[in-house]
Amino acid sequence: MRHRHDLRAAGLRASAMTLVLVAALVTGAAPGRAGEIVPSVGLTKAVNGGGEATAQVGLAFRGDLAPFLMSELGVTYRSESRFDDQLKLRMWPVTASLYLKPLPALYAGGGVGWYHTTYDYAPGVPIADQTKQEYGVHLGGGLKVPLGAGAGLDLGGRYVMMRDQNSRLIPQRFDPDFWVTSIGLAFKF
């Protein structure tokens, strides 16, 4: 019972932080400050999954809150196989991040995320598929390379940390942490 209360409290804190970051992004777009939309593709790999890296796609919206501080709201899609392809995870992370920019081309920081996760079991496994909502945190950074006045190349990476997950397969628990590297094209507006 206590564990469920702790998870609910953590979810409420993450939701509150996300709302604060969204409000900061919306109100922080003062005249003269540029926003960006960044479609991206990349590779993602589970830290303890033992499988191959798989492709991921994403879309992020960024805005400068100050000359040295950038906010980001992002959505991605990723999938991975576990337990010798007996379980396929499909995940739709929705994240909010704050990045420090010590130089205009470099950024580093972290944030929170809501991870809509579907557990698809192989047809021969007598377990029903299920979908869960999880929360996590991430650390990351990147390099922005200008391609002109209105666009730039964005090279990024992040490490995502989540609580261990239960599985109906053996072993019954697994570490869902993963890393992502991506390349995107940032369009300024």
Predicted ranges, named:
Residues 1-35:
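Cleavable N-terminal export/targeting peptides
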Residues 19-20, 27-28, 160, 185-188:
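Hydrophobic alpha-helical segments of integral membrane proteins
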Residues 33-45, 106, 178:
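Transmembrane beta-strand segments of Gram-negative outer membrane beta-barrel proteins
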Residues 41-45, 122-126, 165-168:
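Extracytoplasmic loops and strand-loop junctions of Gram-negative outer membrane beta-barrel proteins
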Residues 46-55, 83-87:
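Solvent-exposed loop/turn segments connecting transmembrane beta-strands
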Residues 60-155, 161, 176-189:
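Gram-negative (and chloroplast) outer-membrane scaffold detector with strong preference
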Residues 170-174:
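Short proline/glycine-enriched turn/loop segments at secondary-structure junctions
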